[in-house]
Amino acid sequence: MEKTTLPNLETLDKQWYVIDAAGQRLGRLASEIAMILRGKNKPTYTPHLDTGDFVIVINAEKVIVTGKKSQQKVYHRHSGRPGGMKVETFEKLQARLPERIVEKAVKGMLPKNSLGRQLFTKLKVYSGSNHPHQAQKPETLTINTIPGGNN
């Protein structure tokens, strides 16, 4: 019987991917990003190791949600003080901090432990089409989140 071998973290090469979020659906995009961060798209995937790649998301301000979610979806945050709960709709948060929408969606799809926090540091989200990671030579990754669409 052959033994199962674990991937050596020193020999794993981490790729950098650029994903354009313009016109993409938020949840479907976030699940694809989480899968890449986790490394589930690779044959070397191991549940307890960080075998995933780095992901750069550009045009985060152009991500879309369907239905009435732009007015009805709310984001909560709390200052930690009594009465410190702040509630904000998708539209208002998108106008104020569009990167946070994609970050929160992806973070919710990662493990809730130290590995998940480590994986989250490999996600870079930018609201414009420019990013400061050209030196890493990122590869463009096309994700189609609209079923039947040509996007």
From Swiss-Prot:
Q: How does it assemble?
A: Part of the 50S ribosomal subunit.
Q: Which Pfam families did the record assign?
A: Ribosomal_L13
Role played: This protein is one of the early assembly proteins of the 50S ribosomal subunit, although it is not seen to bind rRNA by itself. It is important during the early stages of 50S assembly.
InterPro entries hit by this protein: Ribosomal_uL13 (IPR005822), Ribosomal_uL13_bac-type (IPR005823), Ribosomal_uL13_CS (IPR023563), Ribosomal_uL13_sf (IPR036899)
Recorded hits in PANTHER family, A to Z, give: LARGE RIBOSOMAL SUBUNIT PROTEIN UL13M, RIBOSOMAL PROTEIN L13
Q: Name one GO biological process term.
A: translation
User: Which GO terms of the molecular function aspect are on file?
Assistant: mRNA binding; structural constituent of ribosome
List UniProt keywords, sorted A-Z. Ribonucleoprotein, Ribosomal protein
Q: Which gene encodes it?
A: rplM
Give the UniProt family note: Belongs to the universal ribosomal protein uL13 family.
Q: Which domain of life is it from?
A: Bacteria
Name the record gives this protein: Large ribosomal subunit protein uL13
Please name the SUPFAM superfamilies in this protein's record. Answer: Ribosomal protein L13
Query: What is this organism's lineage?
Result: Bacteria, Bacillati, Cyanobacteriota, Cyanophyceae, Oscillatoriophycideae
Annotated segments matching region Disordered:
129-151
Show the GO cellular component annotation of the record.
Answer: cytosolic large ribosomal subunit
Q: Does the keyword Ribonucleoprotein apply?
A: yes
